Curated annotation (Swiss-Prot):
NCBIfam families: lepA, small_GTP. GTP binds at D15, H16, G17, K18, S19, T20, N132, K133, I134, D135. One of its GO terms (molecular function) is ribosome binding. It catalyses: GTP + H2O = GDP + phosphate + H(+). Disulfide bonds: none annotated. Keywords: Cell inner membrane, Cell membrane, GTP-binding, Hydrolase, Membrane, Nucleotide-binding, Protein biosynthesis. Required for accurate and efficient protein synthesis under certain stress conditions. May act as a fidelity factor of the translation reaction, by catalyzing a one-codon backward translocation of tRNAs on improperly translocated ribosomes. Back-translocation proceeds from a post-translocation (POST) complex to a pre-translocation (PRE) complex, thus giving elongation factor G a second chance to translocate the tRNAs correctly. Binds to ribosomes in a GTP-dependent manner. Residues 3-185 form the tr-type G domain. This is Elongation factor 4. Belongs to the TRAFAC class translation factor GTPase superfamily. Classic translation factor GTPase family. LepA subfamily. Its main location: membrane. The lineage of its organism: Bacteria, Pseudomonadati, Pseudomonadota, Gammaproteobacteria, Enterobacterales. It is a peripheral membrane protein.
């Protein structure tokens, strides 16, 4: 019955114990036996276990018998805590009626704690606070409770103290979940409405979709229709995760489960769409969720032309599992065919690159990451560019606008000076400052290009690891942006072009030329490296040629003989420079990435 179903997510800042708590809930409810239990059960990717972070939201259906003896079905969705994967949180919460907000009592409230709370509050979810890691000697539940009250504004009198590691407080937490979180409000007799929360590619089953039954019931063999595209699909298999993949004949109203269709072209149905029955369709779609636009773009080029098809197919499959991943074909004069890909941040880029390497054995060259710029032309047209080549191809530019983010930084008071200095260095504008008992919330407007690269590391370094931040796109702002092009022996290398602010261009150009001087191997002729903005050369360097000692066998004798040998060598080097090709190793392209990370 629907009144005994509870759908909830676990939300928290990174490293506050979400995945460990999920493990303990699964173990307590008997989802897996002792032999099958491993740490981070729901972190199915090897990459997630290695890094100790949750990348993809995961779902598990648990059977729990309350203290009164009434059986309940709990649908738990574990979510990521890193700012780059906040879109996964909003997608997961769309299927829930409640959220479990975890706060590490050794760390207190951090930026993503506040951000995730706001997302849940906007969706009108019932929020239960759990104070985790209560077993540690450094635990300070009173301080954590005070911070929750002061910074977030939640009454913490009913907060549950627990330890996901030892299991302390887990029974009380489960009882609180079933009593405080409301059951799904759907109608089992209404026309089917199934919200697609996620999808991924399985090499045996094809495309698997994670769905939440908002209204009606879903049976194996039903013919579904997408309310977005109108396409029809036949249900081949349905089931739930316990966390094992268990097949079922029916998914009832309020349940969260998986779906496999006989039609393989389900790929065209986007995450956030609604399925309904083709014979008895619903009148309107479920309220979905807005697909986030990528913040960071980079060119990905496979090493070796034979890998082109594998690379295209790999991106196709990964985009099913990750709806925020954008890609389109791109051609570079120097690197050949590849794809221009969009990401939510540098960690997202790093994860995708690592998955392509591990899951598809692809070695890739990655060009310098950049943000999207808004271009206003003389005839008042708005154009968005995500690559240096697109910006260079435009003429009649009236102004270039860069994206600006609203950044909230939560930090201890004693590090306030260092963090403000860092924000000023990053061209930031202070919007607000709020003092709490021991912490401060700083609100700054910062250019997104300054945030995406190494701001996270710098803010952690300036605060000795205690500061945390979250950000969201605010607007586009007029800015003095320039393209730095790299010429090697007067030949433009498009893959090394970078976009930067005018103030940093000279420093950036010199740094890039110096890096390239060290990385390009010496050859039989001089290699001239130039960094240019338009027709102006802002930096120049030379990789000196290798020279054979042609005078080694001349012991004394007429000086004209020596001059002739040196002249012939000089002329030979000239001819070689005209027809010779400069071989650039792969490390050269990594230098551009490194230069971006070394911005002032």
């Amino acid at each position: 019955m629907i009144k005994y179903i509870r759908n909830f997510s676990i939300i928290a800042h990174i490293d506050h114990g979400k995945s460990t708590l999920s493990d303990r809930l699964i173990q307590t409810c008997g989802g897996l036996n002792e032999r099958e239990m491993t740490s981070q059960v729901l972190d199915s990717m090897e990459l997630e276990r290695e890094r100790g972070i949750t990348i993809k939201s995961q779902n598990v259906t648990l059977n729990y018998k309350s203290k009164s003896g009434q059986p309940y079905q709990l649908n738990l969705i574990d979510t990521p805590g890193h700012v780059d994967f906040s879109y996964e949180v909003s997608r997961s919460l769309a299927a829930c009626e409640g959220a479990l907000l975890i706060v590490d009592v050794t760390q207190g409230v951090e930026a993503q704690t506040v951000a995730n709370y706001r997302i849940a509050k906007e969706m009108n979810l019932k929020i239960i606070v759990a104070l985790n890691k209560i077993d540690l000697s450094t635990a300070d539940p009173n301080r954590a409770s005070q911070e929750i009250k002061n910074i977030i504004g939640i009454d913490v009198n009913n907060a549950i103290q627990c330890s996901a590691k030892t299991g302390y407080g887990i029974p009380e937490l489960l009882e609180c979940l079933i009593h405080d979180i409301p059951h799904p409000q759907g109608d089992p007799c209404a026309p089917l409405q199934a919200l697609i929360i996620d999808s991924w590619f399985n090499q045996y089953l094809g495309v698997v979709s994670l769905i939440c039954i908002k209204n009606g019931k879903l049976y194996k063999g039903d013919v579904l229709k997408s309310m977005n595209t109108g396409q029809k699909y036949t249900v081949d298999q349905i089931g739930i995760f316990t966390p094992k993949q268990v097949k079922r004949e029916i998914l009832d109203c309020g349940e969260v489960g998986w779906l496999v269709c006989a039609n393989k072209n389900i790929i065209k149905t986007p995450v956030g769409d609604t399925f309904t029955l083709s014979t008895h369709p619903a009148k309107k779609a479920c309220h979905g969720f807005k697909k986030l636009q990528p913040y960071v773009y980079a060119g990905l080029f496979p090493i070796g032309s034979k890998n082109q098809k594998i690379f295209r197919d790999a991106l196709y499959k990964l985009s099913l599992n990750d709806s925020s991943l954008f890609y389109e074909p791109e051609r570079s004069e120097f690197l050949g065919l590849g794809f221009r890909c969009g990401f939510l941040g540098l960690l997202h880029l790093d994860i995708i690159q690592e998955r392509l390497r591990r899951e598809y054995s692809l070695d890739l060259l990655v060009t310098a990451p950049m943000v999207v710029y808004e271009i206003l032309t003389i005839d008042n047209r708005i154009i968005y560019v995500d690559s240096p080549s697109k910006l260079l191809s435009l003429t009649k530019i009236k102004e270039i606008r860069e994206p600006v983010v609203l950044c909230n930084i939560l930090l201890p008071k004693k590090y306030l000076g260092e963090i403000i200095s860092l924000c000023i260095k990053k061209r930031g504008t202070q919007i607000d400052i709020i003092y709490h008992s021991t912490q401060v919330t700083l609100t700054y407007e910062l250019p997104m290009s300054e945030i995406i690269l190494n701001f996270f590391d710098q803010i952690k370094s300036a605060s000795h690891g205690y500061a945390s931040f979250e950000y969201k796109f605010s607007r586009f702002q007029r800015s003095n942006i320039v393209c730095i092009e790299i010429l090697i022996n007067k030949k433009r290398i498009d893959a090394l072009t970078v976009i930067t602010h005018q103030e940093q261009s000279i420093y950036h150009g010199r740094l890039l030329v110096n890096k390239l001087q060290k990385l390009i191997p010496r050859q039989q002729f001089d290699i001239v490296i130039q960094a240019t903005i338009g027709k102006r050369i802002i930096s120049r360097g030379i990789v000196k040629q290798l020279r054979k000692n042609v005078l080694a066998k001349c012991h004394g004798g007429d000086i004209t003989r020596k001059k002739k040998l040196l002249y012939n060598q000089k002329e030979g080097k000239k001819r070689m420079k005209q027809i010779g090709n400069v071989n650039l190793p792969h490390t050269v392209f990594l230098a551009v990435f490194d230069v971006n990370n070394n911005k002032k």
